[in-house]
Amino acid sequence: FNDDPAWLVLSTAAYLKETGDWTILDEAVPYENQPGTETPLLEHLQRCIQYTLDRIGPHGLPLIGRADWNDCLNLNTFSDQPGESFQTTTNRDGNVAESVVIAALFILAANELAQIMAHLGRVEDSDQLKGQAAEMTETIKRSAWDGEWFLRAYDHFGRAIGSQHNNEGQIFIESQGLCTMAGVGVKEGAAKKALKAVNRYLATDHGILLLQPAYSQYYLHLGEISSYPPGYKENASIFCHTNPWVMIAEAILGNGDQALDYYLRINPSQREAISDLHRCEPYVYAQTIAGLDAPSFGEAKNSWLTGTAAWNFVAITQWILGIRPDFEGLRVEPVLPSGWDGFTAARKFRGVTYQIDVRRIGRGSKIALTVDGQPIKGTLISSPSSDKVTVNVTIG
């Protein structure tokens, strides 16, 4: 699963942003839990980046391995034996099949590690990482743009997956959200096109589908994803874990209305109004909601078995409300839905309580902050003067 290294970098960056505890980078961590192999966590992060760079495929994209985040997209398994594990079986050398999702995660991880290195004063390392992220960005633009949306992968035969030229599985949610989060095509308008395609082809009243059209039969070269009935699990259900990536992507593009709309579509308490259909506890997310192709479209499946709650918390608090930790302080950058006049929030961050009051004063999107009555430049609060801070934010 060649996406794994990126998540260590991203989770460490999230820890650093929240706590400001840079000493964790010096912690000695073993490899594969083997005593005597310990090196500092920072070295592990560097190795994570190099792991991907050492595994690049024919189109310049990262090799997928057995799978990536979607552990049912098994492009090197080719299993024809009932009962055989898709996750542990490999019948191809793995030197061709590539993942656009891993490419996007690599960009995110490399840019985060670049900021970590800059904080540590390692400017040369930081610049190198930024260059590697920029190169992968160009690779996605060159090799993974399908005209209206981002491809999902290339298979063992070098054929595109998630392309308008496919009969089934023409568009996938993951690469649209993650590529936008990574900044790919944001300035050029490609990200905007990709999110429009999500809205047109994947969005439903019950959430955003993982892919469309659903796979109608088992495909040896695709693996477990095509073994499920259409509309269930990874085969075109509403896979809730991925929906917040699109919410975040919409917020990045300034689309607060669309971000909130998607948030509410899968929100458990919101769906209690249709509990006879949803059939899930009103206080918990499900892994999936049956998709358009399923007989039980809109019915929740596998409650609790998901990372959706954590990701939706990030989407609503850090990107729609816009209160998010950064390496050098707390950033307040709301993307308000048009129907909101503002909001108030209290945020405890690194021993300081921030009382935040956000008000819309016009139709524009210009953000201005005052901290304890004093205007500041930008949206980052880096040097609070006490353990209780009042933040006033105007938008318009």
Where are these regions (language model features)?
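A general structural signal for short secondary-structure junctions and capping/turn motifs
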Residues: F1, L16, L42, L53-R55, ...
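Aromatic-rich carbohydrate-recognition surfaces in CAZymes
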Residues: F1-G65, S99-A103, I107, A236-A259, ...
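Active-site acid/base region of carbohydrate-active enzymes
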Residues: A6-W7, A14-V100, Q128-F157, K193-L222, ...
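Short helix/loop capping segments that flank catalytic or ligand/cofactor-binding pockets
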Residues: E27, A182, G189-A190, I356-D357, ...
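Catalytic cores of carbohydrate-active enzymes
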Residues: L105-I225, L264, P268-F297, K348
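Non-catalytic C-terminal accessory modules of carbohydrate-active enzymes
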Residues: R200-A203, S216, P229-N235, I248-G396
